[in-house]
């Protein structure tokens, strides 16, 4: 069974992690608070350029307010928000992580 993965915060770090995990076949849900960004990801996927080249991958992206209605439980949740959003985002994400799930802090110190 494939692990269910959530990424809270889809800026530079969250986008990079989410795009690579999705490309490798993992079931990833991206959660972000910026509606236009969510719309763009839904319409265009994520485009990544790194030292190994470029790729675009379609992603499952949802807005924070839509995530509040989710019943899904995740095995792994990445916290990829700015430091000033850590507390509320961690509390928000907690209800979606399985009891034996893991939260990975992947903040970039901004």
Question: How would you describe each model-predicted region?
Answer:
Residues 62-110:
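Rossmann-like NAD(P)(H) cofactor-binding subdomain of soluble oxidoreductases
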Residues 1-50:
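NAD(P)+-binding Rossmann beta1-loop-alpha1 motif at the extreme N-terminus of oxidoreductases
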């Amino acid at each position: 069974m494939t692990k269910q993965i959530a990424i809270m915060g889809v800026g530079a770090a969250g986008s990079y992690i989410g795009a690579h995990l999705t490309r490798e076949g993992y079931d990833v849900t991206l959660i972000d608070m910026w509606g236009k960004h969510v719309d763009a990801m839904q319409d265009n996927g994520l485009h990544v350029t790194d030292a190994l080249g470029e790729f675009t991958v379609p992603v499952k992206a949802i807005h924070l307010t839509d995530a509040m209605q989710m019943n899904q439980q995740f095995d792994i949740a990445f916290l990829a928000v700015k430091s000033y959003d850590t507390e509320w985002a961690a509390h928000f994400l907690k209800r979606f992580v399985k009891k034996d799930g893991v939260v990975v802090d992947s903040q970039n110190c901004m």
